[in-house]
Regions:
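Intrinsic low-complexity, intrinsically disordered or marginally ordered coil/linker segments
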Residues: 1-156
Length: 156
């Protein structure tokens, strides 16, 4: 199974989440809602980097997803397969969330910290787990918008 996962991850057209929890053809027009409901995120994995694949029974890799971690896909796959265990660690600085999810074959647990509602916990976890230390306060959208209007000369 690990070699199959590795080949999917190495294929530029590979779609690991669809391999884990296949989207029915009948849902192709409703892909957005189906993906969110079944994978937990809107698109499959991108920017995949295989960190370690030395053993036939484990693989470590990092990836990007849109807006949310694909915990639902990993959990459904693990519960259906019976041989799968996982430990996900994730951080999304753009949307300001960080967390983890584990499944050991019997027990599932996850922790999600929203940086907008729990800024201190978010900063602590992102610093401890990801080494991130540069904390900039987000610029208000109105200031960003005003600057864009000015830069494009739309205020004249």
């Amino acid at each position: 199974m690990i070699s199959e996962i590795k080949s999917i991850l190495e294929d530029p057209e590979g779609d690991l989440l669809n391999w884990m929890v296949p989207r029915p053809k009948a849902e192709d027009e409703n892909w957005y809602n189906w993906n969110i409901e079944n994978w937990g995120t809107k698109w499959s994995l991108s920017d995949v980097y295989i960190d370690n694949c030395a053993e036939e029974d484990s693989i470590e890799f990092s990836f990007s997803t849109a807006w949310a971690p694909p915990i639902d896909a990993f959990r459904s796959w693990a519960e259906r397969d019976g041989r799968v265990q996982f430990n996900l660690e994730y951080w999304e600085p753009g949307c300001a969330f960080v967390g983890s999810a584990i499944y050991d074959g019997d027990y599932f647990d996850d922790e999600y910290i929203d940086g907008n509602s729990e800024p201190d916990a978010y900063k602590l976890r992102a610093s401890a787990d990801w080494g991130y230390e540069e904390w900039e306060e987000p610029e208000p959208l109105t200031e960003w918008y005003k600057q864009g209007v000015e830069d494009k000369g739309l205020n004249k």
